[in-house]
Amino acid sequence: FQDEDLLPSKYFEIDFPMIVTRKLHSIKLKPLLSKPILDLHSEDTLQMDGHTLDSTRYAIIGADLRDIPELEEKLKKCNMNTQLPTLLVAECVLVYMTPEQSANLLKWAANSFETAMFINYEQVNMDDRFGQIMIENLRRRQCDLAGVETCKSLESQKERLLSSGWESASAVDMMELYSKLPRAEVSRIESLEFLDEMELLEQLMQHYCLCWATKGGSNLGLKEITY
């Protein structure tokens, strides 16, 4: 991303306020984290408080994704431009929200951006025996997957996106994606760490998926994006 042409107009990161406070503390203390931000901005263009850092090209915001009005207000304060093509990425986020809460977030995103792509990485196939064992193990650690109902299958993942106002949706499990990687790259990855339980790894990858949905962007070819 040193090439200016590859940089997004602005990058937004959202996490719980308590997590953002810790991240901001690390950014302040570690030059390795602060230097890339300062290289792109003069110090007088940076705004920071306990739960937010905002600048011309980067913002990190402390917010609860279940509280849409608060989220929207904070994004507006950081000058999010909903007219620009926007990529939204969630990694094991929606599964910790109730289906109603995640649907509200997805509908808000679909309604807010003129041209957008939403990428979601989380669990899938959670109705089978392996999935149930995963759920039980997490519950024993007091980690409840409030939105696991929508993680039954690839179809339920796609339907969740389409019913929330996205125009197209696709989903693939991670084992399928892994099988499509170039063999040389797979060998390189597997040489980094010895895996003596390939069957377990395959089962795990069959229970995580990548889903993506698009809205608008026909001139950008968003609907044609595949793997």
State where each predicted segment sits.
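Alpha-helical subdomain
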Residues: F1-Y227
